Design a protein with these regions (language model features):
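Short amphipathic alpha-helical segments at helix boundaries and their inter-helical linkers
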Residues: 55-66, 87-91, 123-126
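Hydrophobic pocket-lining "lid/loop/helix" segments that shape and contact the acyl-thioester
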Residues: 1-78
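Hydrophobic alpha-helical segments
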Residues: 66, 70, 81, 95-99
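Conserved beta-strand-centric core segments of catalytic alpha/beta enzyme folds
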Residues: 93-126
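Buried hydrophobic packing segments
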Residues: 32-33, 89-96
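Active-site-adjacent helical/loop segments in soluble small-molecule enzymes
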Residues: 77-89
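Short Gly/Pro-enriched loop/turn and capping motifs at secondary-structure junctions
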Residues: 56-58, 82, 115-117
């Protein structure tokens, strides 16, 4: 095994196809957002914030365009912290709360995607 690692080190490194992840996220995230809203009898117009995994700005902008929802409803902080993996949504939610951007009764969609091309979404009322 160790000898194989020396001969073929590329097989033992983490790799990511950024273009494939972008295409995946832009296709799956809007679909799962629509699905979670439908299951909760809500429309996009009733949602105050859509908080996505903070992978990169291009994905957030593309999801905003695809859903035809103003980018202002998609808070972002990746410019401050980068991609913090599974912590990105909780960090942004906490930051918004500390900055008093979240108000009682607001409806929020949380949508994540990541390793292994997994994805999911939930709706909460603040």
């Amino acid at each position: 095994e160790k000898e194989n690692q020396k001969q073929h080190p590329e097989e033992y490194k983490m790799q990511m196809d950024g273009q494939a992840v972008f295409k995946f996220a832009v296709r799956q995230v809007p679909a799962v957002i629509k699905e979670v809203l439908e299951k909760n009898n809500l429309s996009l117009e009733e949602i105050d914030w859509i908080i996505l995994h903070q992978a990169n700005r291009r994905i957030v902008e593309a999801v905003s365009r695809y859903l035809n929802v103003p980018l202002e409803k998609f808070p972002m902080n990746m410019q401050e912290y980068g991609n913090t993996s599974s912590a990105s949504i909780p960090i942004l939610l906490d930051e918004m709360n500390r900055n008093q951007r979240l108000k009682k009764g607001q409806k929020i969609v949380l949508a994540g995607f990541g390793a292994g091309l997994t994805w999911g979404a939930s709706v909460l009322e603040w």
